[in-house]
Amino acid sequence: MKPSSALAVAFGIVLLTDLALGETPPERKRSDPPVIQSSWDDLLEGVETLEDWRKHREVLKTRFLELLRDDQKPEKPPLELEVHESVTVDGAYTRKLVSYNVEADERAHAYLGIPLKLEGKAPGIVALHGTFPKGKERAAGLVDNPDKAYLDHLSRRGYVVIAPDHFVAGHRIPPEGPYETGRFHQKHPEWTAVGKFTYEHSIAIDVLQSLDEVDPERIGALGHSLGGHGTIFLAAYDERVKAAACNCGASFFRHNPTVEAWARDHWYVYFKHIRPGLLEGNLPPIDFHEIMALIAPRAMLDLSGLNDGIPLTQRQRILMLMKVMDVYELEKAPQNFAFYVHGRGHSVAHESRQLIYAWMDTHLKPPSATETRLVTE
């Protein structure tokens, strides 16, 4: 039977089946793809050239720093890095509990993972935990969910990893409980929690770069949930981050029915100063597509679940990410941006972890680490 005859027979069978089911087959015409428009288009409004973007980027960076209240950060103290304990894990890497100064009267604790068999200097990773009281312990694979044991996983892959406590978790849980920011705001009434943790995560990069084992030019950052959007903020803030991966980071400001969660009046308060505006229906002058675009042309991977939170808000995330890609294309670096959308909710499932780690390998290791080879026999 000729291909055209077979196609006609198949079409006839489909037609008879539709008629038998009482349905008339739809008439479908050829069409060109429509232009996709969204509110996220304002990212490049008035921008035609790379030079235009670079000028607009400076405006956005200023707005970002104002959102953080970065001018309220304290003077950075000397690190004075101390090692409190050191153990060898499976003959693969050394795990150290360390502390270092983040303010004149405040020290942060973190776990460091340093591979034992290094050939030359290694890339360094800042691994940020989610909202969990013992976050650095979870990142080290010592408690809770081993899916989130980034320090353990990546140290075995040849990375030097620092997993710091969030500033109201671990060794610095306030008397009121984990993630209570009241005392922080009493100490720094004009600063923001996001400004505080971003500043501290930048100091974690200082720690990595102070180590003989680390190549200071190959620094990455990754995290889940609170650590996910913490990664976005850090990569936008500190250009030493060459590769970033945000897993299930929080929702943005627009198209978010629960936007007040960014400025609660209790417990963990991200941005205290924007609460009056939010209650009046006014959003900050910068949103997440603009913050994420500040990372370009450096490598950025976003992973999210369509069923992680409000369904329509999560679908807006895809439109937002498509617009961020336009910036990477303008920067002639589309290979440095990617996003992965799944249906596994608020998780770091196996395939997500493999994608994150491969992303780091691609952008922080030499090409030989990821190249494929033909079979010779």
Q: Which residues does each predicted region cover?
A:
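N-terminal pre-domain segments of enzymes
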Residues: 23-70, 369-377
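Primarily recognizes the serine-hydrolase "nucleophile elbow" in alpha/beta-hydrolase
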Residues: 203-275
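C-terminal catalytic histidine-bearing segment of alpha/beta-hydrolase fold enzymes
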Residues: 322-377
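Bacterial N-terminal signal peptides
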Residues: 8-18
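Mobile cap/lid helix-loop segments that gate and shape the active-site cleft of serine hydrolases
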Residues: 188, 243-291, 313-321, 329-333
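N-terminal cap/lid segment of alpha/beta-hydrolase-fold proteins
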Residues: 72-120
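Cap/lid segment of the alpha/beta-hydrolase catalytic domain
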Residues: 120-121, 126-210, 257-258
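Conserved strand-to-loop "acid loop" that flanks and positions the catalytic carboxylate
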Residues: 296-314, 343
